[in-house]
Regions:
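Short amphipathic, positively biased membrane-proximal segments
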Residues: 1-356
Length: 356
């Protein structure tokens, strides 16, 4: 049964990825959008401008999806087909690879056609920057950076957590990532309340972002990129970004495309100056299609790793954990039996001594 469930988990991840690639995000009744509305309602009820309230909000908003995933896992522990179907549905729900590549392609088409106003209107689908004063190179840079970071957030990380932790991992990761987008940014309202959500998202993306960087280096030639240059830029610049994770993805993408990312980012009401990543010219419209191609190749590579995990490493880890638990239980039983026997012998000795 354990082997069948492992195969079902892997098959569900592959099927969910295929659904996302073919259909993209659901146009109506998207579960993630529904979660966002529920989380927004919860925030309005529990909000206080302190970290304790934010931690409680994060624990509840992430804990419920994790418990739902755990209940579904228990309910399908002897039903491989049911597990595969639920895993496929959850994977499709939490992935955003097709939508990400589509937005990059649309932005590239608008910029190549000289329609900067249309590109500015479209930028909100990718990031939260203020597009009103951005020219073509800055719009292209914002798009490349968003594609790089969201390849990790919307593709690699969900697949990785789905492989390692199954349904609870898929749902819990997407919940945490959604909360980070809602309350994890720097603003007067969320400076303290959003700390827990931001830190949790950083923690959950530590490994996926680095894997995304490595995979971006590996697949750079699929978009006529230089693997050696991508490797050098990634090693040199990945830790210069203020985010512990975004720089991993953006530095690798900058090296793969041969462009320079970073600079001044303007948001609504504030601006940030980021270190430069890469050595080339500023991105142009022609780079967006290549960035989308790299994102797709990284997603396929991550899928291969994720699908292999449940039937290889995960299976071995499960067997090892089961062996440890069985040995621990056997040792505990032996110790308990020995203690009981000694106790019984001591009591018998006391009764015998009293009789004499």
């Amino acid at each position: 049964v354990r082997q069948s469930i492992a195969v079902a988990n892997a098959a569900g991840l592959v099927a969910g990825y295929a659904l996302d690639s073919l259909l993209g995000d659901p146009r109506r009744w998207h579960p993630v959008a529904g979660f966002g509305r529920a989380a927004g309602a919860l925030e309005r009820r529990v909000y206080r401008p302190d970290r304790a309230a934010g931690a409680a909000f994060t624990a509840l908003a992430v804990g419920v999806p994790v418990l739902v995933g755990a209940a579904a896992t228990v309910g399908t522990r002897h039903r491989p087909l049911g597990r595969a179907v639920l895993t496929a549905a959850a994977t499709w729900t939490v992935l955003g690879g097709r939508t990400l590549r589509h937005e990059a392609t649309v932005m590239g088409r608008a910029l190549r056609g000289g329609d900067v106003p249309a590109a500015r209107r479209r930028l909100g689908h990718l990031c939260g920057r203020d597009p009103s004063a951005l020219d073509e190179p800055e719009l292209a840079r914002a798009t490349v950076e968003s594609v790089a970071e969201n390849t990790s957030d919307a593709v690699v990380a969900p697949l990785l957590w789905g492989a390692v932790a199954g349904l609870p991992g898929l749902l819990g990761y997407r919940a945490a990532n959604t909360l980070d987008a809602m309350v994890g940014h720097r603003s007067p309202r969320y400076a303290r309340f959003g700390t827990a959500s931001a830190r949790l998202d950083d923690l959950l993306n530590l490994v996926p972002s680095r894997l995304t960087g490595l995979l971006t280096v590996a697949v750079a030639p699929t978009a006529h990129g230089d693997r050696g240059r991508a490797w050098r830029v990634w090693l040199r610049d990945r830790d210069d970004h203020p985010s512990p994770n975004a720089g991993q993805c953006e530095a690798a993408m900058a090296g793969a495309l041969g462009v320079r990312l970073g600079g001044r980012n303007v948001y609504f009401g504030r601006s940030e100056v980021r270190p430069y990543l890469g050595d080339g010219p500023r991105p142009e419209a022609r780079h967006l299609k290549r960035a989308a191609r790299i994102s797709g190749a990284v997603g396929l590579a991550a899928l291969g790793l994720a699908a292999a995990y449940p039937v290889t490493v995960g299976r071995l880890a499960g067997a090892a954990a089961g062996s440890v638990l069985r040995r621990t239980a056997a040792a505990g039983t032996a110790v308990a039996g020995s203690v009981l026997r000694r106790t019984a012998a001591a009591r018998a000795g006391r009764r015998g001594g009293g009789g004499r």
